[in-house]
Amino acid sequence: MPVSAAATPAATDSATDAAVCAPLPVLGRDVLVPLVTGGEVEYAALDIAASAPALQRVWDDVAAYAPYYGSVHRGAGYLSQLSTDLFENSRAEVARFLGCREGDQVVFTRSTTDSLNLLAAVLPAHTRVFVFETEHHASLLPWEQRADIEVTYLDAPRTPQQAVDTLERALAEREPGSASEGFEKSGGGAQRSGNALVCVTGASNVTGELWPVRELAAAAHAHGARIVLDAAQLAPHHPVDLAELDVDWVAFSGHKLYAPFGAGVLAGRADWLQAAEPYLAGGGASRTVARRVDGGVDVDWHTTAARHEAGSPNVIGVYAIAAACKALTEAGFESLVAREQQLVERVRAGLAEVPEVTVLSLFGDDAPRVGVLSFVVAGWNSSHFAAALSAEYGIGVRDGLFCAHPLVRTLLGAGSQAPGECGAPEGAPGEQSLNAIRVSFGAGTPDEHVDRFVRAVKELVTDGARWSYRTEDGRCVPDTAAAG
């Protein structure tokens, strides 16, 4: 079936027609920061894609629990029992948020990166992994750590339909008797098995574009493969339902979901998780440990999520994720999506009025996206531009390659050997460099912060920076020894 905008995750008519909600209260909303030109201004946090501030409700819930903190699954006292119940109730809340199916497991980790490395660690030997080169490094790199895994890197698609077609062709070529030409592979010495895994993002951390997750999942399953969804950028903006999207696993981070307290999630099918050795060995992952007659040790590992949660768990981080899941659900994703789309259109319309600005995209300027846009400005070093937004306007954005080097190189038309490094300026202020600027926003972003950003871009392009800048320790910073 052809891929359309309506087939992308949660890109529904109801999101367009829903009532627009007010920004959700977030911690630090009224923080003032100094300007290099003098005075202070309310900080405009427009780097939500990197890490989101805590929802005020999440902070309040965590603060209310903190005096009652106790060890989880490790104590008979009241606070330990309360904390254990809170931890497991949080697991159930996350399962509801993700639409987990009967038999699915919710494993708590440190982050999306940790979740995908966990999945890589439990893959059956000789599994073939298919991943688009457009992925964040958290999705792109973990599979290479297994010498017995073969990885197929798929070229960047230019339309959602091309993404599905590319995946279907690659999966068909792995089947017995088929050729396997046209794709770059690693681990060529690995044996072949029937197991295959597709790893795909739900929303790009560079362009914000929504990927055709349902169609990719259908293609994977039609060819006997499984699929994991990197929802780090999707879950904070759109509902994620394992059953509805028909994905096998989903991974995301609390710090992207307005719960920045050091926890993440891997949720989905239990069989590979139960069959593999624990991701970490230690207390809590085992049911019994006994010495053998020969002097060794026999271990009976848990078959629940605890198998991969060795060590004292981060109950505050887990509770924060559950609180964020509940807060977003109660706020209503339809109204949250509707408001965010208004902000997206506001930024796109404003940047379109600046000829020097080029917004980066894979699927086209009108592709559905979450509140993430990356762009370059003709005649500007992106690091210099981002530094000026911060120092002169109190606006926090990100510059660099966004831990998605192959994708940004593709979008900028640069070869794989072109110099460039994530997050660091590659030239002096005013020189061109292989990096871009990213602006991102979400449930807590007020309209006036977006409007200030658009005005600042226009002023910088028209009038230039009002201050001098220099490179220091890999960062572009105001030169306080000289006025601009």
Predicted feature locations:
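Pyridoxal 5′-phosphate
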Residues: M1-G484
